[in-house]
Amino acid sequence: MSKKNLFNDFSAVSTKEWKQKIQVDLKGADYNDTLVWESPEGIKVKPFYNTEDIASFVTNVATPEWKIGQAIFVQNEVASNKKAVDALKRGAEDLVFTIPTDTIKIDVLLKNINLKDIKVYFYFQFLASEYIAKIEELYKDNATNIHYNIDIVGNLASSGNWFHNLTKDHQELDKIATITNTQNTIGVNVSTYQNAGATMVQQLAYAMAHANEYLNHFKDTTIPNFTFTVSVSGNYFFEIAKLRALRLLWKSLQTEYNTTANCTILAVPSKRNKTLYDYNVNMLRTTTECMAASIGGADTICNLAYDAIYHKDNEFGERIARNQLLILKKESYLDVVTNPADGAYYIESITHQLAEKALELFKSIEATGGFLSNLKSHQIQKKIKESAAKEQELFNSEKEVLVGTNKYINKEDKIKEDLELYPFVKTNARKTLIIPIIEKRLAETVEQNRLKDE
């Protein structure tokens, strides 16, 4: 008995035919006004998509097998090592360490951690080539699994200053690239832009312009591998598309510079949409964001604990965050499907629209001197501030909803007595070379007013 393809019994339906049918169902209402909406990125989202929307392009971006990351701020290397080993036993697969000073002993921190199988991402709050040299000497046989995330441009953007100064920072960068044999040397912290209020097009364009500063610097030598740290927010399908667009844009830069330098994506949930009140909703938000990161093609996903903005690190919050990822991986099987977003017309369409718009903005940044020049003239800061203000107005007018904070509020909810960390923007009076890009949550003003009334 031969198998019959049931789809042969149905003729293809064109876009024109779909729109005609929808117009009938709308009974006179305007199609564009009723069903088409525009994203903050200027992308018009239609009520349906088909092959005609992706006829001219195919993404063709491979999705890696993603890993579960565990973030650890290292204040004491012995305690942090114990925490890391325990996290690995409980389901973590990669480790993400923030190193505050050069007094931290890396051999103690990484004791009993198998670097042949486990990726380690470092974020250094200082810049010292001698420190990197010690790590390379200790772990030269497994250096391919160490990501150093050296990001002097990102430090300038977020703090307003170089680690040392322009010349010395670049000298240290060159030394580190030589020491690490241009392995996973460079980091590009895109999270700063997202958490400060940049649109997705801006995030992608700034990521490319940011990376291009390093590519230009190393163009006459071997270009190191890059790690992009990307924050993922609640616009589910757009966030999937954003990560896919990032890989497309990186391929364009690879072609331009004739390099095979890798692009690793470390995805983390955004802090911008997280809230103090009705804080359990943060778990729902981060689950959606981690799922988007998985489908979008992140290499490592490091979840954010539901109480991270107001509680110190604690075992309960971190266990829940890790278990969210374990459920997505072990119970939902999101790690066994190759390129799960392939063939989704909507995602394919917005992937390419985001990439095209970001490429256009990237070119305009390069035409006006590049990323550093635009940081120094404060054009980047100005554009992010404008986008953040527009989003804030949407939140204030309840057009952008954060459940439990600006809509469906539980007035009996109290949080003041639970605050262990200061959850709002802190400003330190100090001299800076440029205006720093400041991260700020949408709910801060509302929460400050509610705290006064408790």
Where would I find each of the regions flagged by the language model?
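Catalytic alpha/beta active-site cores
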Residues: 1-231, 235, 304, 435-453
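Predominant activation on well-ordered alpha-helical scaffold segments within soluble catalytic domains
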Residues: 23, 85, 107, 136, ...
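A glycine-rich phosphate-binding loop feature that marks nucleotide/adenosyl-phosphate handling sites
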Residues: 36-41, 151-153, 190-193, 225-233, ...
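Conserved, mostly hydrophobic/aromatic
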Residues: 42, 91, 250, 296, ...
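Mobile "lid/hinge" segments at catalytic clefts and subdomain interfaces of large enzymes
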Residues: 184-212, 295-299, 304-338, 342, ...
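Short glycine/threonine-rich loop-to-helix capping motif typified by GTGT followed
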Residues: 199-203, 235-245, 272-284, 312-321, ...
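Glycine-rich anion/phosphate-binding loop at the beta-strand->alpha-helix junction
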Residues: 208-211, 229-321
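Catalytic-core signal marking the mid-to-C-terminal active-site face
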Residues: 319, 323, 329-454
